Amino acid sequence: MKTTRDGADDSAAAGNLRDGSAHAAYVRDAANGKAPAELEALVRVLEARGCELVRPNARRGLHPLVMPLAATTTRGEGGEDEEEVYGLMMTEESGGESVMPVVRVRGGVHAALVGKSASEFVHRAIVEEEARSDEERTTVAAAAGAVGVSLHNHGAFTTSGKEFDVYVTTHIGKFPSSMEGLVKRHLDRGDEQSALITCDLYKSTFGEWGAPHVFISDLYGKLGRDEEARDAARHALQTPWSTIGGSEAIERMIRVAGWQGKNVAEIKEVLESRRGPSAAAFDGPKSEKQLAREESELLLDQLAAGEIEAATVNQRLAECYMNAGKPTLAKFIMCGSMPTSA
């Protein structure tokens, strides 16, 4: 049997990773949350796709708000091997069951949304297997077990006659990669207007993430619409920088925005000044909670920009979340600073 990435053997510890119980317990203890019902299916699907399972507390060097599930190695843009970590991102308390999107993290801190929920990720993975397989291969579907059966009837994609991104968007949900695929589909057909309309839908669906704005900025640039490319780049820099797509994308957005040579704090000052003095007067003095929230955002953006390291920021980040009235996130951050144990 295969060992896990962080050295767990084929004992009960490894079994607890494969059935999701270790990660579910960590969500409960470290985040005061309830793990998604599909967590076991999600973990088994990731393993079926070739990932190695990762202990939930193996968080050193990882985005402070991500609990790792599994990891794999891929080839980076420069030809070098690069680790990808799949995990659940902790979000602000919503008063009910925790909302934990599935993310893929590269470079330790750059998070891409790959599923708004565990259920949607599993469903898409099953359909992707059906779309790519020339044979009746159902490795991923089998790994998903009863959850997979409840989500997808085998052969439904094939008999639908729809393209993959169209099927996913209409039968499962919206995913950044599929939204981008739909835009490219329109462009390949010479339908620029439909492509831009789809961009608007993409932005309205995932506007709090940086990647959609990067994609749209790049598209406007290719179309020679430089002013709109600049505006989209500036929108990207107003989102969490860890969601922009990586160091190269961050640098490109800063350049397209016209803010070369500025660091994170300076760019935030520019963005604040663009609101105008009347906005500040209307808002009134900032509360301690608001100031703490803004500092937490600054720290995470500086982390994504490579200006600071996670090991040096976690304690202050946890303090900011506590002062901002987000004790659950503060606790999760501090748990990430604890030594990894078997």
Regions found by a protein language model. Name each.
Residues 180-188, 200, 214-218:
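Amphipathic alpha-helical repeat scaffolds
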Residues 169-176, 189, 207:
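Alpha-solenoid helical-repeat scaffolds
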